[in-house]
């Protein structure tokens, strides 16, 4: 549980990332960041879909993207407060069209799946002895992926993705006593490896049923990721220090299994010449999470609802620069997987962003997000979170034969 009184120490993020596997990263695409995260049903020829592999099927040039994320958290527990900011690598993706006519596109990448980042001190006493307990954690899970999409029949886009999970979760607990130099501590390190699979589909034929013009489209999408079983190698490092002696010990490694539950998402989107509107719902069955066969009472099923839009004033490359920039706005509500002290931890946020053309097909996508999470009830933490996403992407033709003279 989150302690009654916490002092926020040094670098670190929210204490909520102490639970489960940390804060879950949800990144649909560079474009979706400014749209509340909505985009599971969006088909694009210049934005690489990370979650729904069916969204790759319209890419017709070799495309790449690399992303970074700044996250600043202002957190308080009703007594103490603090602000922490840090910049993270947020993934690299590449997509290569094999047969654009048939929607066959291969993609590969490495992206964050979860992140642990906290550093708090809790003062306490026992039998008239004052002491501080220092909780610190870092690490997280990374996902390497290999995906393929196809267009087997008109308007039905399908995709499949192989996911390889890897990472290390570190949690350290240290107790120090009064003004003395004595302390004892234990560091628990989990090294995780495992695989999973994702399948998805987008249906783009609704415009025909509704007799929309060729310039418009109305899509629905679905994506499903399987339950994954990760092998966990656990090590514990013990430290005890007095004024005259420092003792360190390492416990033998143990092999366990961690169960990452399945997820299911649905989305709809409408695209016209100038506007894109999208809405999604994404669910993950975290009640089924287990470590070494034991479930976590601090976790619950999660739901994320997102809605957003994009305005592109002009598609003509000869139009004024500011009219060739897409402008984005969105909202999301994340009923997160945290349930601390029997209190659900929910997050509500507003997002915005825009794309900056650089030259050719190279562009920068900026996404800005401000959200609120948690509560100070029961002296838990309330977080105000600012996130700034930066993505550099582009495309070019590969494997094209020159025309014969």
Which stretches of residues belong to each language-model region?
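Subset of outer-membrane beta-barrel
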Residues: 10-405
């Amino acid at each position: 549980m989150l302690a009654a009184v916490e002092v926020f120490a040094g670098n670190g993020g929210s204490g909520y990332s102490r639970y489960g596997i940390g804060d879950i990263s949800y990144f649909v695409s560079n474009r979706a960041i400014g749209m509340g995260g909505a985009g599971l049903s969006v088909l694009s020829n210049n934005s690489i879909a990370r979650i729904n592999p069916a969204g790759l099927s319209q890419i017709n040039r070799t495309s790449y993207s690399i992303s970074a994320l700044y996250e600043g958290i202002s957190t308080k527990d009703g007594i103490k407060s603090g602000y922490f900011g840090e910049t993270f690598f947020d993934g690299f993706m590449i997509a290569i069209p094999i047969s654009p006519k048939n929607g066959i596109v291969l993609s590969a990448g490495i992206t964050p799946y979860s992140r642990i980042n906290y550093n708090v001190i809790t003062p306490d006493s026992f039998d008239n002895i004052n002491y501080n307990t220092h909780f610190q954690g870092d690490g997280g899970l990374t996902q390497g992926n290999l995906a393929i999409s196809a267009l087997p029949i008109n308007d039905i886009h399908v995709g499949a993705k192989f996911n390889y999970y890897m990472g290390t979760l570190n949690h350290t607990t240290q107790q120090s006593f009064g003004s003395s130099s004595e302390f004892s501590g234990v560091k628990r390190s989990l090294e995780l490896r495992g695989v999973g699979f994702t399948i998805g589909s987008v249906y783009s034929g609704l415009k025909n049923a509704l007799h929309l013009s060729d310039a418009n489209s109305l899509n629905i999408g679905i994506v499903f990721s399987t339950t994954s079983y990760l092998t966990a190698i656990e090590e514990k490092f013990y430290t005890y220090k007095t004024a005259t002696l420092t003792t360190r010990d390492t416990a033998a490694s143990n092999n366990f299994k961690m169960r990452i539950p399945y997820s299911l998402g649905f989305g709809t989107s409408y695209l016209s010449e100038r506007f894109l509107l999208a809405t999604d719902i994404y669910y993950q069955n975290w009640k089924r999470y287990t470590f070494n066969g034991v479930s976590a009472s601090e976790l619950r099923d999660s739901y994320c609802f997102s809605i957003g839009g994009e305005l592109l004033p002009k598609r003509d490359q000869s139009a004024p620069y500011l009219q060739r920039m897409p402008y984005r706005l969105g909202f999301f509500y994340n009923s997160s997987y945290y349930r601390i002290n029997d209190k659900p931890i929910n997050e509500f946020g507003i997002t915005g962003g825009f794309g900056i053309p650089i030259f050719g097909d190279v562009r920068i996508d900026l996404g800005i997000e401000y959200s609120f999470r948690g509560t100070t009830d029961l002296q838990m933490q309330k977080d105000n979170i600012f996130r700034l996403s930066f993505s550099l992407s582009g495309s070019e033709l590969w494997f094209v034969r020159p025309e014969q003279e």
